[in-house]
């Protein structure tokens, strides 16, 4: 990936340019993904210098933590003590584990601004937990059941009916999502899972026929909608852009914009991708929230510049004025 290999910063410009702040993108490749999110990483690296930020990619697996009571940073990369960044953008996605969360917490404890914080990343990673919080706040979500083996098929049929969606608790880009059309399909599938992986963590989710093969993806930064698109499956019921689905811009109403802001507030997120399903009763139900959303499809479909929104949001957080930014970029005399 050229942008990552070259750090995406022109050497000559780096020598003369001053930066508003420095940042890390916490990222590791995920072999289980249909498509690696190299696009998003490259875009964040490419756009950083244009906004007077210096950003590099750090794999959390390369980080060593030193927890002590001394006033020392306690962060090492590949065994070397490093200067702390001013901010961190976590992009671990489904590869998030205890260690990467510990790295994020350590950075937070040392005063590094994290976009999002460890609590928000952990919440988003658990599909059931964030739906529980949203449901408790009165926001519309699909009916959801946590799987216990053996599965009570009578209960599922009574409370949800069929078809029913089966999901792993952790997964992105449509991976780990299956549709069981009837009771027999569900029983056969879950018996197979129980026999091969009895500790598997699964949820069952209400299937909304109005949303078969389509949903709405919204990307929000700071509680405001950057853009929204309707995703449409080419075949089957999964509408993910990364799996070859089509997309078109979607106009989001004021009422729905308020619900997005409420989701962001409840989950304490700075940036998120929110997936909404169509429902004839309430209009939309919140299906899932992602703390490190892909935005290749959104940029291509809606013509927005997502990294620009992210860095402008950081401008506000770090109280960097437009005049100060222009000086840093050499647009006006220093």
What are the language-model segments listed below?
Residues 171, 223, 279-282:
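Short strand-connecting beta-turns/loops that link adjacent beta-strands
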Residues 70-71, 212-213, 280-285:
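A short, glycine/Asx- and small/polar-enriched loop/turn
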Residues 16-45, 82-83, 105-111, 115, ...:
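Active-site nucleotide/adenylate-binding loops and adjacent lid/helix of ATP-dependent enzymes
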Residues 164, 226-227, 272, 285-287:
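Protein kinase-like catalytic core scaffold
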Residues 1-115:
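ATP-binding N-terminal substructure of ATP-dependent carboxylate-amine bond-forming enzymes
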Residues 178-267:
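Phosphate-binding site of ATP-dependent enzymes
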Residues 94, 290-302:
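Glycine-rich phosphate/pyrophosphate-binding beta-alpha loops
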Residues 192, 237-286, 308-334:
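A long amphipathic alpha-helix within ATP-dependent nucleotide-binding catalytic cores
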């Amino acid at each position: 990936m050229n942008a990552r290999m070259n750090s995406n910063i022109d050497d000559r410009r780096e020598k003369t340019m001053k930066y508003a702040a420095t940042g890390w993108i916490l990222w590791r490749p995920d072999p289980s993904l249909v498509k690696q999110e190299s696009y998003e990483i490259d875009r964040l690296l490419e756009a950083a210098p244009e906004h007077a930020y210096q950003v590099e990619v750090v794999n959390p697996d390369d980080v060593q933590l030193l927890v002590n009571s001394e006033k020392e940073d306690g962060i090492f990369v590949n065994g070397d003590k490093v200067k702390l960044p001013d901010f961190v953008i976590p992009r671990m996605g489904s590869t998030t584990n205890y260690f990467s969360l510990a790295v994020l917490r350590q950075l937070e404890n040392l005063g590094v601004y994290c976009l999002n914080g460890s609590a928000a990343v952990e919440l988003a990673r658990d599909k059931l937990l964030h739906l529980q919080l949203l449901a408790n706040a009165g926001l519309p979500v699909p009916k959801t059941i946590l799987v216990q083996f053996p599965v009570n098929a009578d209960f599922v049929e009574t409370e949800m009916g069929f078809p029913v969606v089966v999901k792993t608790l952790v997964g992105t880009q449509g991976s780990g999502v299956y549709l069981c059309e009837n009771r027999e399909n569900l029983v056969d599938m879950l018996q197979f899972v129980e026999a091969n992986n009895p500790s598997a963590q699964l949820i069952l989710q209400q299937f909304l026929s109005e949303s078969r093969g389509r949903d709405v993806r919204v990307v929000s930064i700071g509680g405001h909608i950057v853009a929204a698109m309707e995703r449409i499956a080419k075949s089957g019921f999964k509408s993910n852009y990364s799996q070859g689905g089509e997309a078109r811009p979607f106009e989001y109403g004021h009422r729905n914009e308020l619900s997005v802001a409420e989701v962001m507030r409840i989950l304490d997120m700075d940036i998120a991708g929110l997936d909404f399903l169509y429902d004839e009763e309430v209009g939309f139900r919140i299906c899932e929230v992602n703390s490190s959303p892909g935005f290749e499809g959104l940029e291509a479909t809606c013509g927005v510049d997502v990294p620009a929104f992210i860095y402008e949001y950081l401008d506000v957080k770090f109280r960097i004025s437009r005049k100060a930014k222009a000086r840093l970029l050499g647009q006006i005399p220093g």
